[in-house]
A protein has these predicted regions:
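Conserved N-terminal phosphate-binding loop of PLP-dependent enzymes in the Aspartate aminotransferase
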Residues: 23-476
Length: 476
């Protein structure tokens, strides 16, 4: 790619203290890293460490591979950040964006206006999602979608005559975004420490069988884990609890897969206490679990749902809130003006790309492929890694997977310095040509839905080699 723009930079070799205009096309990797370190503050990173070592400069991608400025070709086992469901280089999405940019590159939805792509997308999402979710509010990220849903929920209960119902219950290790509101709903302690945890948010343990199941069978653990929600509702008071928010599979928390029956108990508890159930499908949506949404895979009926990532396969930013009929009916009839929205809500280019993306997923049968072929094959291919001396558990759900690393299988015994070993293993995987993510000491996979069996075999081969190198480095 050619960069015609010139920049004035004082941080590259050959620049004087006053800076010099430079073109970007001929920069070396080290110069790109220096320029990046000088000006770019990336998300979720240690700035000091990043500036010491330099960022990996990704230059281009095609199919299931990303390429960096050093010429390395890396199989993307994370689909970017859980989002590139249809793979890279899809000209259909590029062409959809180009056509829409030519016709209507932008107009807002504030002034009693709409546009054709967003209207068509709204109808399509109502068709694809579980019954009773027929209205859509658009934002730009999962964070914004979950922030929006919290506002809607509290507004709804005020209209119902229960303004005291404001408490949102989430789960430890839950991730619902990084705005103040969505981070408060999530259960990431580091995020709470850096930004004051907002009032009216509570958290319970997740159904993390690897840590909490012990000797219970699956049915016992499902009932016990759901009882943690009932107990917290009793502590807070059902008359104060507005909603329970949960990812069907907790992705950024480490691909925590609930036992069968867990959500059946959870939904019964919510109905009994008249508490709204919110499904955060930002990661699990658009085919990743073998149905369009994990709510369908798990037979859930959420009152509201958030989505992003796979909505456009990450090609452009877009998210959405699916509003259930009960909430939508009240907001429409009695809510008056809803004082919330974004400049880019329902952006016509994003909507056009989303429609083209959904057409690819449907036309290529990717949902069915995950359910009938690649999802089961991923589970089968990864299962032998559970015997590795460094692995305590392998868990998969559709095209989501986690390899839990342990110091010893007895117990199992976890590593004392949580996250260090995961980072070592991740680095070995990347050096070997596979992009994996480390969450604490779990190695995470969330590949494009277009992955083939050959891609899965390559993934397992590199992952096994990374495990071997990590164990050898640790002397295990």
């Amino acid at each position: 790619m050619s960069f015609g723009i010139k920049v004035k930079c004082r941080f590259l070799a050959g620049c004087n203290e006053h800076g010099a205009d430079m073109t970007l096309d001929e920069l070396s990797t080290r110069e790109w890293q220096a320029l990046d370190s000088a000006h770019h503050m990336a998300p979720f990173c240690d700035y000091g460490e990043l500036r010491q070592h330099g960022a990996r400069i990704i230059t281009h991608a095609e199919g299931h591979y990303i390429h960096d400025s050093e010429g390395n070709r890396i199989l993307d086992g994370m689909a970017g950040l859980w989002c590139v469901n249809v793979g890279y280089g899809r000209t259909e999405l590029v062409e959809a964006a180009s056509r829409q940019m030519t016709t209507l590159p932008y107009y807002n939805n504030f002034f009693k206006t709409s546009n054709r792509p967003v209207t068509a997308l709204s109808a399509k999402l109502a068709e694809l999602t579980p019954d009773g979710l027929n209205n859509v509010f658009y934002a730009n990220s999962g964070s914004e979608a979950n922030d929006t849903i919290i506002r809607m929920v509290r507004h709804f209960w005020a209209l119902e005559g229960h303004p005291e119902k404001r408490v949102i219950i989430g789960r430890d290790y839950g991730y619902h975004g990084s705005t103040i509101m969505s981070a408060s709903a999530g259960g990431m302690s580091g995020m709470h420490e850096q930004a004051a945890h907002e009032a009216d948010f509570e958290h319970i343990r997740p159904p993390y069988g690897f840590l909490y199941q012990g000797n219970q069978d699956e049915a016992q653990f499902a009932a016990n884990a759901a009882s943690w929600l009932a107990d917290r509702i009793a502590e807070v008071g059902a008359d104060r609890v507005a909603a329970f928010i949960a990812e069907p599979v907790q992705g950024a928390g480490g691909v925590i897969i609930p036992p069968r029956g867990y959500f059946e108990h959870v939904q019964e508890i919510c109905r009994r206490h008249d508490i709204l159930f919110i499904a955060d499908e930002v990661i699990t949506g658009f085919g990743r679990t073998g149905q369009w949404f994990a709510s369908q895979t798990m037979d859930l009926q959420p009152d509201m749902m958030t989505m992003a990532k796979g909505l456009t396969s990450g090609y452009v930013p877009m998210s959405a809130v699916m509003v259930g009929d009960r909430v939508a009916t009240r907001l429409i009839a009695d809510g008056g003006e809803f004082y919330h929205g974004f400049t880019y809500s329902g952006h016509p280019v994003a909507a056009a790309v989303a429609l083209a993306n959904l057409e690819i997923i449907e036309g290529e049968g990717l949902v069915e492929r995950v359910r009938q072929d690649t999802g089961p094959y991923l589970a089968e291919a990864l299962a032998p890694l559970a015997e590795h001396r460094l692995v305590g558990e392998v868990r998969t759900y559709g095209m989501l997977a986690a390899i839990e690393l342990v110091k010893s299988k007895d117990g199992p015994e976890l590593f004392a310095d949580t996250g260090t070993v995961g980072a070592i293993c991740r680095d070995h995987a990347i050096a070997g040509g596979l992009m994996m993510r480390a969450v604490r000491d779990a190695m995470i996979l969330s590949p494009p839905l277009t992955f083939t069996r050959d891609d899965i075999d390559e993934t397992v081969r590199i992952a096994r080699r990374a495990l071997d190198l990590t164990a050898d480095q640790l002397g295990l």
